[in-house]
């Protein structure tokens, strides 16, 4: 949609969460290793809300407790410890993580805290075994430069990452504690972003600065973006868990569409004098003989069917608020999250799903549903049905007031779904088990004297020093292999840097697309490949096959891989001899086509010599020998 975002008063702020690539976790000596093998054990917990010192209970925490969920935590004996399981106090903060936080703060022009105090931030979804996350305020009031102008950075915090979610059931959530405690930077911007494109550019720039340090983890799940979005007459919506940079634009666009649509629905409902009836009616007896599979299944499991009446809502529940999502979807999200039900039916979409027209007529009569009214029904266990319908009643009332402030989950299609209300602001408490950290001027001076080269500077240098074209230089600057590239290019000056860069950026990706596990490759393997190339043990055409050989035989050395693959570097004399044989074997074609036989002969030469001789040598030798025959 082409909106006038300035007229709409769009304001967007980002929260970037980036894992740091440290040797140990933030509060213990466990490695920062994510595992997918079978865990060694599990524990179960139930978290309950408690009053603050002021006598208040956080509304998000209270809401979470109403779900009556238990939390299951998987652990490993050799890479996790009692700190993650909240059975041992936290150790001192990892110094490496603090140094990286100060470095990033300097690169973003932040004002540093004199002293870093570890705080406890309430976490209500079970993703931390203790019920809170340890976090440290490091710096404030900085900015980043973008093509759209400067964007303020409110704060940078150093905190522990949450558990990794494994499974989400109706009455339980299963986590693994291997990710819990990995150092994480939380970078929060001011709401200075005024368009979707600007939002994407801001996130890209922050990511660029983080990667420039060389001290952050790479790959899916290592960086997560939360996006706060609002427009005039709307509400602040926090969208959690945007993992793909390219999705940020669409998330912002679709949330603007959603808020505009919900405001239009509100105006229409007010015109109609719409009313939400609080009464929940039992319609189990009315639909006991239904052929609807969903309703029959609920009744078979000793469930009930109940319904509510929404006066003036006819046609509104089925109205689209985001691409493919309707007001009814908003109601359904609330019912699913707060009631634990699978979904709901509403009369805007009936008859359907096995519910007949006759049953709809009976339902409307029973509920006293007029022409402009709508009915919502839910089938499940009695307590779940009532929780779900009460949640829908609340959401329906909100639709006549405006847009509720919510935390929503980012979906893969650029839409969002309900997670929970926005949490209260005062969720931070001092951590009494970890001493404070004093930030001295000497420490800051050391950080300032060791800042990394920024990507834009590195790009110019790569083009000038290594003669990479601009596109390849851009890829290399942003690559996980950037340090390895520089090391190999300096170590093996005989090899063109372009070949090293394309191998690291293109060849490895092509091999991965073929289904081979490039993860088993080490820097030592790649060093052996280019060492062999520089010593003329192999040709550059052999590089992909040699890399595949290392993937298939990671314990072998280069000579062993070359032997397995049947590759060795031939002398010029050997190449000339083989090419002469190929020409003689195809002499009738040579006599008929002359130099026009070059293409056919080149193909046959490469089939026999690929991997054993340089392609350029093969080409020049063939041309020379063919001319001799033709003349």
Swiss-Prot record:
Heterodimer of GatD and GatE. GO terms for biological process: glutaminyl-tRNAGln biosynthesis via transamidation; translation. The keyword Nucleotide-binding applies. One of its GO terms (molecular function) is glutaminyl-tRNA synthase (glutamine-hydrolyzing) activity. It comes from the Archaea. The keyword Repeat does not apply. Allows the formation of correctly charged Gln-tRNA(Gln) through the transamidation of misacylated Glu-tRNA(Gln) in organisms which lack glutaminyl-tRNA synthetase. The reaction takes place in the presence of glutamine and ATP through an activated gamma-phospho-Glu-tRNA(Gln). The GatDE system is specific for glutamate and does not act on aspartate. InterPro entries: Asn/Gln-tRNA_amidoTrfase_suB/E, Asn/Gln-tRNA_Trfase_suB/E_cat, Asn/Gln_amidotransferase, Asn/Gln_tRNA_amidoTrase-B-like, GAD-like_sf, GAD_dom, GatB_C_1, GatB_Yqey_C_2. Keywords: ATP-binding, Ligase, Nucleotide-binding, Protein biosynthesis. Belongs to the GatB/GatE family. GatE subfamily. Its EC number is 6.3.5.-. It catalyses: L-glutamyl-tRNA(Gln) + L-glutamine + ATP + H2O = L-glutaminyl-tRNA(Gln) + L-glutamate + ADP + phosphate + H(+). GO terms for cellular component: cytoplasm. This is Glutamyl-tRNA(Gln) amidotransferase subunit E.
């Amino acid at each position: 949609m082409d909106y006038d975002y300035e007229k709409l008063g769009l304001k967007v702020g980002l929260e970037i969460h980036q894992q740091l690539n440290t040797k140990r976790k933030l509060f213990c000596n466990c490695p920062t290793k994510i595992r997918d093998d079978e865990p060694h054990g599990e524990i179960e917990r139930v978290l309950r809300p408690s009053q603050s010192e002021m006598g208040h209970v956080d509304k998000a925490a209270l809401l979470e407790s109403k779900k009556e969920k238990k939390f299951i935590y998987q652990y490993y004996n050799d890479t996790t410890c009692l700190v993650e399981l909240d059975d041992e106090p936290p150790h001192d903060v990892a110094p490496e993580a603090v140094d990286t936080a100060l470095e990033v703060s300097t690169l973003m022009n932040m004002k540093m805290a004199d002293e870093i105090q570890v705080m406890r931030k309430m976490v209500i979804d079970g993703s931390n075994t203790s019920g809170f996350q340890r976090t440290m305020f490091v710096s404030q009031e900085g900015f980043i430069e973008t093509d759209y102008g400067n964007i303020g950075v409110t704060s940078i915090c150093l905190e522990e990452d949450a558990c990794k979610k494994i499974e989400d059931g109706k009455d339980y959530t299963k986590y693994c504690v291997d990710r819990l405690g990995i150092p994480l930077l939380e970078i929060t911007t001011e709401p200075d972003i005024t368009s979707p494109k600007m939002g994407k550019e801001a996130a890209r720039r922050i990511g660029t600065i983080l990667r420039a340090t060389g001290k952050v983890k790479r790959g899916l799940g290592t960086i997560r973006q939360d996006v706060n979005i609002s427009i005039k007459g709307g509400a602040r919506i926090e969208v959690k868990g945007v993992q793909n940079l390219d999705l940020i634009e669409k998330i912002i666009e679709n949330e603007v569409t959603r808020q505009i649509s919900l405001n239009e629905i509100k105006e229409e409902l007010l015109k109609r004098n719409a009313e939400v009836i609080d009464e929940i009616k039992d319609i189990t007896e009315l639909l006991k003989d239904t052929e609807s599979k969903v309703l029959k299944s609920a009744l078979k499991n000793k469930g009930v069917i109940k319904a509510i009446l929404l006066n003036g809502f006819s046609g509104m529940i089925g109205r689209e608020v985001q691409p493919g999502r309707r007001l009814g979807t908003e109601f359904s999200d609330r019912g699913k999250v707060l009631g634990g039900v699978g979904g709901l039916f509403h009369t805007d979409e009936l008859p359907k799903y096995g519910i007949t027209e006759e049953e709809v007529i009976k339902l409307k009569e029973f509920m006293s549903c007029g022409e402009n009214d709508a009915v919502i029904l839910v089938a499940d266990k009695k307590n779940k049905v009532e929780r779900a319908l009460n949640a829908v009643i609340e959401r329906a009332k909100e639709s006549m007031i405006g847009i509720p402030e919510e935390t929503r989950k980012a979906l893969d299609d650029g839409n969002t779904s309900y997670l929970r209300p926005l949490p209260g602001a005062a969720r931070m408490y001092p951590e009494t088990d970890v001493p404070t950290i004093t930030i001295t001027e000497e420490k800051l001076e050391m950080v300032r004297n060791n800042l990394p080269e920024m990507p834009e500077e590195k790009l110019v240098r790569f083009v000038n020093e290594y003669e990479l074209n601009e596109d390849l230089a851009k890829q290399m600057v942003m690559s996980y292999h950037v340090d390895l590239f520089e090391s190999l290019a300096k170590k093996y000056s005989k090899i063109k840097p372009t070949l090293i860069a394309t191998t690291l950026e293109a060849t490895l990706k092509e091999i991965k697309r073929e289904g081979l596990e490039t993860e088993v490759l080490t820097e030592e393997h790649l060093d052996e490949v280019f060492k062999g190339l520089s010593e003329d043990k192999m040709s550059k055409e052999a590089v992909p096959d040699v890399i595949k050989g290392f993937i298939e035989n990671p314990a072998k050395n280069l000579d062993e891989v070359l032997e397995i693959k049947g590759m060795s570097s031939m002398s010029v004399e050997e190449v000339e001899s083989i090419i002469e044989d190929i020409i003689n074997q195809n002499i009738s074609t040579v006599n008929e086509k002359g130099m026009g036989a070059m293409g056919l002969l080149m193909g046959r030469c490469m089939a026999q010599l690929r991997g054993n001789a340089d392609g350029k040598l093969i080409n020049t030798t063939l041309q020379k020998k063919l001319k001799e025959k033709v003349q």
